[in-house]
Amino acid sequence: MNQTPNANRLHIALFGRRNSGKSSLVNALTGQDTVIVSPTPGTTTDPVTKAMEIHPLGPCLLIDTPGFDDEGELGEMRVERTLKIIGKTDIALLLCETGDAQEQEWLQRLKERGIPVILLLNKADARPNTTELAEQIKASCGQPPIIVSAKDSTGIEAIHRAILEKLPADFGEQTITGSLVAEGDVIVLVMPQDLQAPKGRLILPQVQTIRELLDKKCLIMSCTTDKLKDTLHALANPPKLIITDSQVFHTVYEQKPAESRLTSFSVLFAGYKGDIHYYVESAFAIDRLTEQSRVLIAEACTHAPLTEDIGRVKIPHLLRKRTGEGLQIDIVSGNDFPEDLSPYNLIIHCGACMFNRKYVLSRIEQARALQIPMTNYGVAIAHLNGILNKIVY
């Protein structure tokens, strides 16, 4: 379980004031000295993550955040980073001290984003009036806090139980291939080994898709683009589904048997991580782009650009081939994502294998709130190749 990608783990974030004991609580929850602890306020200057497992829930990711009461120029920057963590959060642990206006504001902020919140009153070992404070927090925040001591582990099991109770009903139910495949289906995977393919290994979407197909007891054949015809000829019957790299969508479409359905890894991840229906609807905004338009391309991972880079080279080339060279394209990566999306006519996101579903959906909602179309690499490439209505998802 330690090898479960962070993107597939339940994201549990701790929020609270500086020196409220968030870092000590992370250490208590993990049973390790994961985070530096100090009585000096503001020790945590950046979000810190720690992968762990909570039985019987499974793999989780704890996120320790800077205090939301930080001050000064640097303090404001730290608070901004804490705010960005909200978009990734599946369950929030909010450390309260009195239930005052600031803590109520953060509770409301989290609830408005649809995030289940567990209130905690930490440092029970050092407070003479713990019971009275807990009643005060319950009265002001509308729910009782769990009384906790990170020092002697009081309340840790209660936190585990509360996390299980607050687990989103649909968490972990989303699958990569959905209802597209069934036991015994023959599936062909087309995986070009170009400059973008890491030497000696497969990229994460391919690995996860193969694992899921094995779990579903499908029969898998894989090949590079130039060996697709040979692969198809080796089969007694056409495959039920062909999953390809989006970059060779058109090539594979021209060679596939009429009986075989076609999709791509990126398109599958559009539904696995995001909102496939909004992505498909938004892809038609490509037809409305002009040289005066502005497009944002967002990558989840950070890497040195390559000559055949799909996000930085191939998609911009396809777009400008259609609209003209004047089309303005901005590219961001990792957690960098503009707070103000209003200048953009279209957003094109990668498959987001490195992000959890909650984070991708929060970006989609940010765009949708401004009525800005947002699609992903695979869906956009399918539309640009004129085959969006001929693929499955």
Where are these regions (language model features)?
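C-terminal effector/interaction modules appended to NTPase cores
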Residues: 2, 17-23, 200-393
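Canonical P-loop GTPase G-domain recognition
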Residues: 113-118, 123-179, 186-188, 217-226, ...
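G-domain G4 guanine-recognition motif of GTPases
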Residues: 65, 95-99, 115-132, 146-155, ...
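Conserved G1/Walker A P-loop phosphate-binding module
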Residues: 1-76, 80, 84-87
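Long, well-ordered amphipathic alpha-helical subdomains in the mid-to-C-terminal portions
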Residues: 180-208
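Conserved C-terminal guanine-recognition region of P-loop GTPase G domains, centered on the G4
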Residues: 50-58, 63, 73-145, 176-179, ...
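Conserved hydrophobic helix-helix packing surfaces used for dimerization/oligomerization
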Residues: 12, 187, 293-295
